[in-house]
Amino acid sequence: MKTFDELFAELSDRAKTRPEGSGTVAALDAGVHTLGKKLLEEAGEVWLAAEHESDESLAEEVSQLLYWAQVLLIARGLTLDDVYRKL
């Protein structure tokens, strides 16, 4: 199990080291527009899971939404501190 901060650190490392075959690297290379579309897709899946699926399914969908949100932040050069200042 990872914390939100640990996931961000792992994704940031992948963005820097660019391991071959990394899905995160491929997503970053696809650009902000594609990442934004993916984030919207995941948000819709969270909504549907909240209304029609189990708690476990909802938790999984939220985890995917958080992953894509973090990848988008990294693509834009933002950090979690940038977000935390707005909470």
From Swiss-Prot:
Keywords: Amino-acid biosynthesis, ATP-binding, Cytoplasm, Histidine biosynthesis, Hydrolase, Nucleotide-binding. One of its GO terms (molecular function) is ATP binding. It catalyses: 1-(5-phospho-beta-D-ribosyl)-ATP + H2O = 1-(5-phospho-beta-D-ribosyl)-5'-AMP + diphosphate + H(+). The keyword Amino-acid biosynthesis applies. One of its GO terms (biological process) is L-histidine biosynthetic process. Its main location: cytoplasm. InterPro entries: HisE, PRib-ATP_PPHydrolase-like. Its EC number is 3.6.1.31. CDD domains: NTP-PPase_HisE. It is found in: Cytoplasm. Belongs to the PRA-PH family. HAMAP family: HisE. This is Phosphoribosyl-ATP pyrophosphatase. It comes from Mycobacteroides abscessus (strain ATCC 19977 / DSM 44196 / CCUG 20993 / CIP 104536 / JCM 13569 / NCTC 13031 / TMC 1543 / L948) (Mycobacterium abscessus). The gene is hisE.
